[in-house]
Amino acid sequence: MRLKEIISKIEKRHSKKIDLSLNRTFNLLKKLGNPQNKLNNVVTVVGTNSKASMATALSAILKEAGYKYNLYTSPHLQSYTERFVFNNKEINENDLADLLGGIDKILGNDSATVFEILTCAFIKYAEYFKDNINIIEAGLFHRFDSTNVFKQNLLTLLGVIHLDHLNWLDNKTIDGVIYEKTSSLPISNIFINNQMNSEIKTKIKKSLIENKSKKYFFGDNFN
């Protein structure tokens, strides 16, 4: 019940469910001590479909191999706790209520969307397990998504891209979608994309031409 009350409270923090901007996210992260700069081993997961599948599959592989991970995904099926996994274990309701309640107090009179608050909460709590591999699924696109706060990644997983959420775009084309999802991706030790459509894959490569990540593309480097 306490978690539901806190969620209800933070839902009133901003008039819009989605408001594409990074200003509020960085403002809250600054109040939290910029925890995004203290996390290592960040894995960013972006795409149109299959983001959650890729993230959970990677977490299963890491667990089997004996690694510890933190996992942030959205949306959830039954409880907000499903979105938060730390040290290979889903957070419990009491701990999440404490976490979000603390974040809400620190935010003060400033505004932020629910997703922005949840993302910042995950990043802050992950500090306690900062040596773990941090798997973070992007929300809407990536450029102005609250998960886009890391300067460098261990790994970027880019799933299949196709037309989606066009109501949020001025450029309502596949080029517009690709730009929003890829132009802001951080430099990663490894970048993997499983785009099968050759035309879209070519556009993705063009968008990433200045990104110095070591890139692997389906059909080019693996099958």
Where is each model-derived feature located?
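Acidic, Mg2+-coordinating active-site environments of NTP-dependent enzymes
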Residues: 40, 130-137, 153-223
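Catalytic cores of secreted/periplasmic lytic hydrolases that degrade extracellular macromolecules
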Residues: 51
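Surface-exposed charge patches
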Residues: 60, 124, 206
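ATP-dependent carboxylate-amine ligase
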Residues: 1, 151-152
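Conserved beta-strand segments that form the floor/walls of ligand-binding pockets within enzyme
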Residues: 44, 85, 157
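ATP-dependent carboxylate-amine ligase catalytic core
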Residues: 22, 29-30, 35-39, 64-151, ...
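Short, basic phosphate-binding NTP loop
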Residues: 1-45, 54-67, 72, 76-81, ...
